């Protein structure tokens, strides 16, 4: 019996060894030919544009490229004085003790921005010897531009599946580079803050289950602090307000008390930043006058815009552009489109996990009411939804704004590549759209054609993003 079994055991052992040796054999490689090498190069180049796996290579290159490009532009392109000298004149008056916002002015006009703007440009004034050392200020804006590109790439990375070509469009705007290092507008600081707000809230969504409700709530407070600082620099950040409140409400697990706490933090930040002009501890007649003057001038919602600078409404006759009727029409359109997006997308039952009626009823309950299927707190879909919500809300505001001046491109240029990617048009059509969009902003002065095309591109992009359900609900 033993003799008959030994050969069988030996054969099984050999079979196992043969199997292991076959598994450890080197994989078959294609023949080393010129044709195969060329194909590998072509496939590698295509991957650098199309494969999200290559983002780990593309992003560092883009950040370094931005930093170097800023330095080259600063060294070789003449600085253009528009408003920076006026900013410095206004800061000099404030440094000399002037607190009356109605008296603070410069060559191109009175001060129209809140106290966050004042604090940033006071620092820039100190750094540049009263604004005389322009290259130093340009370097600051160059680093700010590089930081904004890095933060923007991070917001895209948390989405997960964004292809590299969309990242490349982030650094493909000549006008945007000019706004940062050749114009020195305060819009750039507001933009950096808003990208930071988006990133913090995306991170809270991504790690929602890991961090727990307390730490997520603390992250929303950090975002509120940053958002309030953005508003204190320039009021265009208010265009993000609907998106911010919606996202924070869901991250706070639909707890209205937590949302109110977040809003309170925003108010407190405004008070602290504007303390010098609000004179909180004084209640005499002069203090009341200075306080009201600051609020009216820094947060003026009735400012008029000059027709000669408009980028988006050149095809509208000037007499209609300057009328109250046109302003009210745009306001109604803005609110209507926003409500449409809120009801049909942001508050969709496919996203919130409950009907709109239930969502509204739960809003009056002072405790956590969020559904377990809510996609805003889903690790896979949440960061994408948050970026979509912020990007579409802001773009709606930009599209239907009273007027766009050339520096206002910085308001939304950082999320435009993501919206183009979300249309599903692909790199060729999206790249062409981006190029035409850039042409609209490079055309100076704007023309009937350039402004009409700009409005068309923004409208068509928003409509397509809304229509693609997989953007919002996942595949």
Swiss-Prot record:
Annotated localization: Endoplasmic reticulum membrane
Ranges of biased composition (kind: Basic and acidic residues): 1-13
Reaction(s) catalysed (UniProt annotation): an alpha-D-Man-(1->2)-alpha-D-Man-(1->2)-alpha-D-Man-(1->3)-[alpha-D-Man-(1->6)]-beta-D-Man-(1->4)-beta-D-GlcNAc-(1->4)-alpha-D-GlcNAc-diphospho-di-trans,poly-cis-dolichol + a di-trans,poly-cis-dolichyl beta-D-mannosyl phosphate = an alpha-D-Man-(1->2)-alpha-D-Man-(1->2)-alpha-D-Man-(1->3)-[alpha-D-Man-(1->3)-alpha-D-Man-(1->6)]-beta-D-Man-(1->4)-beta-D-GlcNAc-(1->4)-alpha-D-GlcNAc-diphospho-di-trans,poly-cis-dolichol + a di-trans,poly-cis-dolichyl phosphate + H(+)
Pathway(s) this gene product operates in, as recorded in its UniProt entry: Protein modification; protein glycosylation
Keywords: Endoplasmic reticulum, Glycosyltransferase, Membrane, Transferase, Transmembrane, Transmembrane helix
Enzyme Commission numbers on file: 2.4.1.258
Topology versus the membrane: Multi-pass membrane protein
GO cellular component, one term: endoplasmic reticulum membrane
Membrane-side (Lumenal) residue stretches: 1-56, 122-139, 209-210, 258-261, 344-384, 437-445
TM ranges: 57-79, 99-121, 140-160, 188-208, 211-231, 237-257, 262-282, 323-343, 385-404, 416-436, 446-466
An MF annotation (GO) of this entry: dol-P-Man:Man(5)GlcNAc(2)-PP-Dol alpha-1,3-mannosyltransferase activity
Biological processes per GO annotation: dolichol-linked oligosaccharide biosynthetic process
Region Disordered, residue ranges: 1-22
Enzyme class (EC, first level): transferase
Segments in the Cytoplasmic topological domain: 80-98, 161-187, 232-236, 283-322, 405-415, 467-475
Domain of life: Eukaryota
Protein family membership: Belongs to the glycosyltransferase ALG3 family.
Protein task: Dol-P-Man:Man(5)GlcNAc(2)-PP-Dol alpha-1,3-mannosyltransferase that operates in the biosynthetic pathway of dolichol-linked oligosaccharides, the glycan precursors employed in protein asparagine (N)-glycosylation. The assembly of dolichol-linked oligosaccharides begins on the cytosolic side of the endoplasmic reticulum membrane and finishes in its lumen. The sequential addition of sugars to dolichol pyrophosphate produces dolichol-linked oligosaccharides containing fourteen sugars, including two GlcNAcs, nine mannoses and three glucoses.
Name by which UniProt lists this protein: Dol-P-Man:Man(5)GlcNAc(2)-PP-Dol alpha-1,3-mannosyltransferase
Species of provenance: Meyerozyma guilliermondii (strain ATCC 6260 / CBS 566 / DSM 6381 / JCM 1539 / NBRC 10279 / NRRL Y-324)
């Amino acid at each position: 019996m033993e003799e008959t079994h030994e050969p069988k055991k030996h054969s099984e052992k050999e079979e196992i060894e043969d199997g292991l040796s076959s598994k450890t054999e080197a994989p078959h490689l294609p023949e080393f030919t010129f044709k195969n090498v060329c194909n590998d190069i072509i496939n590698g180049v295509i991957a650098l544009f199309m494969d999200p796996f290559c983002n780990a290579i593309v992003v560092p290159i883009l950040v370094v490229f931005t930093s170097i490009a800023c330095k080259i532009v600063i060294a070789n392109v003449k600085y253009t004085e528009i408003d920076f000298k006026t900013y410095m004149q206004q800061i000099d008056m404030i440094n000399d003790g002037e607190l009356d916002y109605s008296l603070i002015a410069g060559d191109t006009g009175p001060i129209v921005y809140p106290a966050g703007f004042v604090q940033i440009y006071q620092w820039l004034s100190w750094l540049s010897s009263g604004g005389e050392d322009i290259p130093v200020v340009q370097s600051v804006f160059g680093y700010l531009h590089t930081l904004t590109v890095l933060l923007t790439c991070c917001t895209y990375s948390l989405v997960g599946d964004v292809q590299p070509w969309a990242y490349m469009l982030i650094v493909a705007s000549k006008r945007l580079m000019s706004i940062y290092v050749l114009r020195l507008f305060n819009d750039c600081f507001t933009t950096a803050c808003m990208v930071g707000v988006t990133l913090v809230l995306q991170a809270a969504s991504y790690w929602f289950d890991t961090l727990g409700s307390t730490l997520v709530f603390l992250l929303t407070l950090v975002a509120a602090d940053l958002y309030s600082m953005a508003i204190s620099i320039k009021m265009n950040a208010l265009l993000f307000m609907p998106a911010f409140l919606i996202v924070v409400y869901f991250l706070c697990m639909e707890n209205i008390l937590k949302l109110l706490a977040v809003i309170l933090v925003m108010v407190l930040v405004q008070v602290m930043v504007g303390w010098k002009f609000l004179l909180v501890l004084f209640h005499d007649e002069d203090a009341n006058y200075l306080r009201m003057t600051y609020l009216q001038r820094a947060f003026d919602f009735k400012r008029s815009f000059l027709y000669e600078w408009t980028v988006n409404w050149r095809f509208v006759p000037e007499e209609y552009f300057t009328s109250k009727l046109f302003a009210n029409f745009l306001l109604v359109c803005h609110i209507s489109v926003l409500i449409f997006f809120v009801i049909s997308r942001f508050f969709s039952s496919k996203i919130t996990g409950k009907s709109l009626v239930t969502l509204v009823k739960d809003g009056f309950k002072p405790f956590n009411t969020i559904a377990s299927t809510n996609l805003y707190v889903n690790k896979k879909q949440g960061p994408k939804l948050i970026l979509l919500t912020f990007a579409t809300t802001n773009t709606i505001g930009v599209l239907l704004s009273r007027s766009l001046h050339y520096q206002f491109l910085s308001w939304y240029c950082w999320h435009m590549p993501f919206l183009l990617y979300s249309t599903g048009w692909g790199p060729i059509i999206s790249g062409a759209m981006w190029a035409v969009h850039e042409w609209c902003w490079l055309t100076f002065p704007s023309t009937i054609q350039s402004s009409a095309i700009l409005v068309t591109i923004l409208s068509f992009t928003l409509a397509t993003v809304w229509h693609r359900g997989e953007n919002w609900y996942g595949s």
